[in-house]
């Protein structure tokens, strides 16, 4: 297993993310999960990541049960405070104590503010809820060894949070892979976090499986260069080449994935610059959808002053893969800035160099959002599941 130094400890470069544990009959397959965690530890993985809502609020319990069979000093456990779910945000003391109990530990090695983003920014930072102050105090007391945050936020929100709180954060977890490097401008996020000297943890390294199932021509291109490397290996090795990435989390769902990933992280085989360029070319070919370049010419003539490129980006993201991020972002906007506020006047389209039928895209996005459960409804469902899990 490859390791990175972090402060005075060695962290496995591969971390076990427990958001996609094996399931049988609609419930977590505890036996297989325990086997996977045992195998992980036997083969050098020492970082385990869970969160309050994972697996219908059952992940913490099963992970805690599995890890409790091992010496506490033999693993590093990360959990997260569900401030992004709003309904749970106002009780940090209650939730933190509950998480410690569910995980059967007296402290968390890493504890993160879960998905600091536009929807929940004010909840996390409002002094009257004392959320951040509470967890800073828990760190002082030794019940949290390292305090950090995960985020799917837009760049301006990330900058704002770091400007205010970087000095009390130990690490940052972002969605990062060779596709989102440009698709979601993860490159800029990586650079911003690095400017604040915060080490980076990676989530969604395979883009929810999108980078596993490449089209045949792309697979053949990679196989011609590294015949014995899988598409999974290419994605991981691209991330290993980023110097500020400390831990790469993988949400493994079965023993086969675990064995494969462990073998990849057994040896460092850096990609050449030419190989990295090939992955960037493959990523560009994967970008289907509305061909917006983000020039913002359309915004100059919009009577509603909509951020059209941002809305189109959310439209493309919704169509590319299942994700809550677009829902959360759009729901954080005032009603008059959402796609449903588009008047359909067409002034924007006449200024678009790509000849995009922008009013039609806004209409389709508004319709699609109306057919999906709101982020608030999703949070309510998660809260109900959490109560049942108690």
Question: What is the role of each PLM region?
Answer:
Residues 101-123:
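Active-site groove signature of glycoside hydrolases
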Residues 116-306, 310, 320, 324-334, ...:
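Beta/alpha (TIM)-barrel catalytic core signal, keyed to glycine-rich beta->alpha loops juxtaposed to Asp/Glu
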């Amino acid at each position: 297993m490859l390791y990175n130094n972090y402060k005075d400890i060695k962290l496995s470069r591969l971390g076990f993310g427990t958001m996609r544990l094996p399931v049988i009959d609609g419930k977590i397959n505890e036996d297989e999960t325990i086997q996977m965690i045992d195998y992980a530890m036997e083969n050098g993985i020492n970082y385990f990541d869970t969160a309050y809502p994972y697996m219908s609020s059952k992940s913490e319990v099963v992970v805690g049960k599995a890890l409790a069979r091992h010496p506490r000093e033999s693993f590093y456990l990360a959990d997260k405070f569900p401030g992004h779910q709003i309904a749970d945000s106002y009780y940090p003391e209650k939730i933190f104590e509950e998480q410690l109990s569910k995980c059967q530990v007296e402290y968390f090695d890493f504890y993160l503010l879960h998905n600091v983003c536009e929807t929940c920014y004010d909840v996390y930072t409002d002094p009257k809820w004392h959320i951040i102050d509470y967890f800073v105090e828990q760190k002082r007391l030794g019940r949290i060894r390292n305090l950090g945050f995960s985020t799917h936020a837009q760049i301006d929100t990330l900058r704002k949070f770091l400007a205010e709180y970087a000095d009390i954060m130990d690490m940052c977890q972002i969605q990062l892979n060779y596709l989102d490097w440009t698709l979601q401008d993860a490159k800029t996020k990586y650079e911003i976090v690095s400017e604040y000297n915060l080490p980076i943890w990676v989530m969604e390294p395979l883009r929810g499986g999108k980078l596993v199932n490449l089209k045949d021509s792309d697979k053949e291109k990679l196989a011609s260069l590294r015949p014995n490397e899988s598409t999974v290996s290419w994605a991981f090795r691209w991330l290993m080449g980023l110097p500020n990435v400390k831990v790469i989390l993988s949400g493994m769902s079965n023993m086969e994935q675990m064995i494969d990933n462990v073998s990849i992280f057994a040896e460092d085989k850096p990609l050449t610059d030419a190989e990295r360029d090939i992955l960037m070319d493959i990523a560009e070919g994967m970008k289907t959808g509305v061909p917006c370049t983000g020039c913002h010419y359309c915004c100059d003539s919009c009577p509603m002053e909509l951020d059209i490129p941002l809305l189109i980006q959310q439209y493309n993201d919704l169509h590319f893969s299942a994700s809550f991020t677009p829902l959360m972002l759009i729901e954080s906007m005032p009603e008059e800035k959402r796609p449903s506020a588009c008047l359909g006047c067409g002034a924007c389209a006449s200024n678009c160099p790509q000849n995009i039928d922008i009013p039609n895209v806004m209409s389709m996005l508004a319709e699609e959002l109306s057919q999906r459960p709101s982020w608030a409804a999703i949070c309510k469902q998660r809260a109900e599941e959490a109560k049942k899990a108690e």
